Amino acid sequence: MDVLRAREQLRRRYLFPQDAEVPLEHEGYPRPETSTAVEKKEKPLPRLNIHSGFWILASIVVTYYVDFFQTVKENFHTSSWFLFGSALLLVSVSIAFYCIVYLEWYRGIEDYDIKYPALIPITTATFIVAGICFNVALWHVWSFFTPVLLFTQFMGVVMLTSLLG
């Protein structure tokens, strides 16, 4: 019976970190002060890293090889989906620049998502609907490649925007 108890205690000992061990027999002894939520100041990632560089480069390559601007210029006036998507994208980008430039840089509000909780869901919803509109508008050009091409363009723009702040 003692062997089973010793094995169980040994198993339990290694379930917890070494500094969390407190002898249960000595109730009168003060317990060591340990914080379960240790807050470490992590060093922020550099703004231009391999990941963002890849997406920016991929966006440039896609823009060049699929004649993106020529296609957009040809389909600009023919599709109401494209015009509606452009208007929604303009709203989304305007809200994003309002958050980044005005609230964060000019007013100095770091946590604008806490002070103005409706901004981020509205921006996200308008951007998703704009993406759907662009997919519908450009589907006849690239077919099944349209979502992939637009996603690559989106990630390139996001990574380029993230260089701002």
Swiss-Prot record:
<keyword id="KW-1133">Transmembrane helix</keyword>
<feature type="transmembrane region" description="Helical">
    <location>
        <begin position="49"/>
        <end position="69"/>
    </location>
</feature>
<feature type="transmembrane region" description="Helical">
    <location>
        <begin position="119"/>
        <end position="139"/>
    </location>
</feature>
<dbReference type="InterPro" id="IPR033579">
    <property type="entry name" value="TMEM128"/>
</dbReference>
<keyword id="KW-0472">Membrane</keyword>
<feature type="transmembrane region" description="Helical">
    <location>
        <begin position="81"/>
        <end position="101"/>
    </location>
</feature>
<protein>
    <recommendedName>
        <fullName>Transmembrane protein 128</fullName>
    </recommendedName>
</protein>
<keyword id="KW-0812">Transmembrane</keyword>
<dbReference type="GO" id="GO:0016020">
    <property type="term" value="C:membrane"/>
</dbReference>
<dbReference type="Pfam" id="PF20479">
    <property type="entry name" value="TMEM128"/>
</dbReference>
<feature type="transmembrane region" description="Helical">
    <location>
        <begin position="144"/>
        <end position="164"/>
    </location>
</feature>
